């Protein structure tokens, strides 16, 4: 059950990064933050636990499929009507033909690098469900295969300050 309160979005993002940090540290992956100062105090209607879980799922995948000594960039941007969280990795990328599939329950990519890693294929499905319950969307953009992926989470301006 989602129980939304007006809370700082940055706190939720930082908590999610902190949960993912040990795995990233093992691979010497650096987290890079990119945001305007005003976003440090940006308040969003959210269930911190559940929204944090949605972000953790995306970050876990970014760490899992990124090479050692790479970086994951987390951008926060305030736009008209919404706030956007971008999570960009330097991993294996996602073929465009799979964009519509990766948010389906139990779907796992077809690349050999995906198959050799453990996973159930439920993380991104749950992230989408949680984000949609927050009135938001999650999409993916990938460069060329093996050039990383960028996940875009958009949350409504409703509750922003």
List each language-model region with its residue ranges.
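Conserved micro-motifs of the catalytic ATP-binding
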Residues: 1-4, 41-46
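A conserved beta-strand-to-alpha-helix junction within the catalytic ATP-binding
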Residues: 3-18, 30-32
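Short conserved segments within the C-terminal catalytic ATPase subdomain
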Residues: 23-35
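Short helix-loop "hinge" at the ATP-lid/N-box region of the Bergerat-fold HATPase_c
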Residues: 62-63
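Short conserved segment of the HATPase_c
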Residues: 94-106
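Short alpha-helical Gxxx[C/S/T] motif in the catalytic ATP-binding
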Residues: 123, 127
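Conserved glycine-rich
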Residues: 136-137
């Amino acid at each position: 059950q989602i129980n939304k309160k007006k809370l700082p979005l940055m706190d939720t993002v930082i908590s999610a990064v902190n949960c993912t940090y040990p795995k990233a540290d093992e691979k010497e992956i650096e987290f890079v933050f990119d945001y305007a100062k005003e976003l440090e105090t940006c308040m969003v209607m959210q269930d911190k636990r559940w929204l944090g879980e949605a972000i953790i799922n995306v970050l876990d995948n970014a760490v899992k499929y990124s090479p050692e000594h790479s970086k994951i960039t987390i951008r926060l941007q305030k736009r008209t009507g919404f706030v956007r969280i971008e999570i960009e990795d330097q991993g294996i990328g996602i073929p465009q033909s799979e964009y519509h599939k990766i948010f389906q329950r139990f779907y796992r990519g077809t690349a050999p690098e995906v198959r050799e890693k453990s996973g159930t294929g439920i993380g991104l499905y749950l992230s989408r469900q949680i984000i949609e319950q927050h009135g938001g969307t999650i999409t993916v953009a990938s460069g060329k295969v093996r050039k990383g992926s960028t996940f875009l989470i958009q949350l409504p301006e409703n509750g922003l300050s």
